[in-house]
């Protein structure tokens, strides 16, 4: 309310007062005093904060400050931005987002409660409160690698953003090692196969990890293999030695072993040796001379259950076939 008087304090009605207001406030540019010399000045604004209102007549001026406050009834999520992404999915390292709450005209709203939700198993505080500038930091952790959708809500206003958690290579481990093909021929070409799977401590698949491989009993394998995006890698092992071989996959201090079996190659069965074990028996049709035959494949692996044909000349008698022992 402005009051206009003459130099001796007498009220002056019908006087035109010029009015100005800053900080985006709106006011009538001139107003006229009532008979009692006063005039009500109405000031509106869509901008929260202090506005200086100045009333002037002739060369006389007075100013007062008025305050406009943001409209909590129209509180909304004005923005939601990711400020830190690609944190390790260890349940401790956090991805960060910043929400900003304003009223319908963009004025920052402090002290507002924002509800927060996060998908894919991520953990976050269910509510956060805005600072004086209308912003609030949102911390999200997870033990699950992948994308988590974070949603901030106030009133009926919501915004969502995706954050990514990555598996923790520091805790890489052999989660499992399984035999996918066994009992291959010990010919140095046919392979037994195993599949290793590498994860972090929380079971998240780790791609691009180098796994060391060892195999005993003369088996040949690549010394290292690299995991695919799903954390798995195929391990191929070959051998020229029949029998059981232990295959061991290692990463960091984590190790797993499985046995595979190579079998002798019946396709290359051969008489490896034939030796006389008893000689000079009496020729009475009963006392026998004996021999021992050994059958192997091309790489010297013994072959059991193989039928060997036998011939003897000069009238000697023998079984026409014999079968090799284990």
Regions found by a protein language model. Give the residues of each.
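The feature marks long extracellular or luminal low-complexity segments
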Residues: 1-326
